[in-house]
């Protein structure tokens, strides 16, 4: 017997029991985003590699080490499985001239791919929901993105998620700060870990996000970006804080908050939990006013966020909400006899027409065995059909969950009967 083929490491199957929770999340997301006027945009999983090099940044970890890239053997194109969704969204907006009709509120969802070391909350194929507001310049849209996240946590029943915010200022102010940060860190070069040394000349702000406990003391003494912020960025950040306070949104200012993607400026934020260990960020985003021009479009402001679905579902699975999410049939149709077997199809389809979830027993078996399967299915009712019932166009309804007397009624009345129990 040949060896069984398994899924690629870090790329997981979503089994039926898990899919119930995914379905609940996806339904909630669609309703939530519609309430804020966001529309769905769907982009290809594969993009030109240069899209991510230009948008994410050539010296980021994602581009240097984590992308799944390959050469198309047919035409020699350098292609990449998308590692994130914002760049693809912006590319589509530019390509199809969507901003010509005004600012856009858009969202996407689907799988992303990064070649990372798999661990809890971090996979090589993972899923994100991303929300993008393109063409909006003020702090009010930054606040909208944050406020809508707070609503989502309530809808999903997720407690104990805290908001951290900061500002990265303008490109000019970051360049000034970058020079000061490098000068400071060079004094501790021998004490820096391998990642920090590599990033020192290429992406020094990412060092601030180090999870290495041995770097903590060095980073605590590092200069603050706030000391170099331009006046417009400070005004923007102050206005954002006022809106959040007025709307009752609690937050912490985290001076070390940076994003792993080069395109961010001004507002950045993360929603964080302590329940997922090192992978505690469940949603992150901010403003990226230069990205549209960077990819080849007419300059326009933009901001957005992305959330990791697997991490959020891990939190939901520990709540009371998860216990109530389980897809089971309303009715399990049991039948005995050749005439009954034929009539059972009509019964099942009639109930489905009325909106009931119905499982029609397949595979034969005794009445006792079928009833056992009906009970195990989780269905509330069994619709029992023998040749006698089939001959008269009737169905026996038995409650599987309550002490209710079994009744025999005409098929034409079954749906109304079940709706009123």
From Swiss-Prot:
Reactions the enzyme catalyzes: tRNA(His) + L-histidine + ATP = L-histidyl-tRNA(His) + AMP + diphosphate + H(+)
Location(s), subcellular: Cytoplasm
Keywords for this protein: Aminoacyl-tRNA synthetase, ATP-binding, Cytoplasm, Ligase, Nucleotide-binding, Protein biosynthesis
EC number(s) given by UniProt: 6.1.1.21
GO biological process: histidyl-tRNA aminoacylation
Principal cellular location given in the protein's record: cytoplasm
Pfam hit, one: HGTP_anticodon
GO-annotated cellular components: cytoplasm
GO molecular function list: ATP binding; histidine-tRNA ligase activity
Transmembrane intervals: none
Subunit architecture: Homodimer.
Family statement: Belongs to the class-II aminoacyl-tRNA synthetase family.
Protein's name according to its UniProt entry: Histidine--tRNA ligase
Organism in which the protein naturally occurs: Nitrosomonas eutropha (strain DSM 101675 / C91 / Nm57)
Lineage of source species: Bacteria, Pseudomonadati, Pseudomonadota, Betaproteobacteria, Nitrosomonadales
